[in-house]
Amino acid sequence: MYVSPDDARSDVILAAAATVLGGFAVAFLTRLPLYPQRGLLAMLLGVVWILALTAVVPLLLSRYRGDRAAAFGLDGPRGAWVGGLVLAAPVALVGIVLELFRSGQVTDVLLGRIGTAARLATLFDAAATTTVVAGLRFAALTVGTLALVGFLAVRGREAFRPTDVSLTQLVRTLGMGAAGAALVLGLLRSLGPGRPVPVLVNAVGLAVLVLLADRLVPAGRDVPRAAIVTPVVVVVVAHVFAAGGLFRGDLPLALYTGALAAGTATVIAALALTRDRAWAILPLAVALHWWPTCLSPLALELGAALC
């Protein structure tokens, strides 16, 4: 299905506005006196906001344009997800190590956010209910990552078509650059309220993820630079605003988590653009949100990951 450059640019703007500016609307609503702050309704609304800020607009636009799965790069062979298991491994290891570092609970570390939710269930939120909602949140974050990053990459390729560059070169340059930036920014922040161990684990995990993705991306494939840069810029801006903005928020935190998100978004976007190996991002997205880590491209994970 052909999408004109003008339509693609409008789609990029709408999807970016939904995730960046939509966050302001959600923040305003959650501060209203009648908004539920506790209980099942509050948790379910949290799941709804995740989908509204990430997946709803891309899904509606893909349906309107008529390209559906192709709008996310997922119209290729689905068996490619098996190759993505190797990408999920370093992310899973990062999640397990950080969970052990935070809680010291060895028994339920493999249960990820589900185990954490059950352990932290309060008197007002029964463990079973909390666990179910945690599962819904995990599913929403996974779908949101696949929809938002894949959609921005595909539409960015169609919206801006300057001279094509090597896809592997973009993965190496942007991905490893993001890992290096995250390491430096995180260590600088650890001089204040941050801690150096999670910074090192996250940065090394991202670097390993980029190196593995570099082996998975087909050599000799050229794409417009904007196809990768578009989702990277959007997720970084979203992280800056989620942390409070340039002047009133925690800018060091925003830049650190934004760098990690940029590296992960680079990997997801690159694989989505290959089409034949795009489904490899599915295991990666699952691992990114089964264990809440700062590697998620979604700023909505900042609180859960304790970045």
What do these predicted regions represent?
Residues 1-8:
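Short, Lys/Arg-rich, polar N-terminal cytosolic tail immediately upstream
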Residues 9-17, 165-174, 222-230, 277-280:
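Membrane-interfacial loop-to-transmembrane alpha-helix junctions, especially the N-terminal start
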Residues 14-66, 113-125:
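Alpha-helical transmembrane segments in multi-pass membrane proteins
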Residues 20-29, 92-97, 175-189, 230-245, ...:
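Aromatic-anchored segments of alpha-helical transmembrane domains
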Residues 34-45, 68-226, 245-253, 257, ...:
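Juxtamembrane helix-loop-helix connectors linking adjacent transmembrane helices
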Residues 51, 150, 265-266:
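A structural signal for well-ordered alpha-helical segments within the folded catalytic domains
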Residues 58-59, 150, 154, 269:
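Transmembrane alpha-helix boundary and packing residues in multipass membrane permease domains
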Residues 203-219, 223-307:
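Functionally important transmembrane alpha-helices
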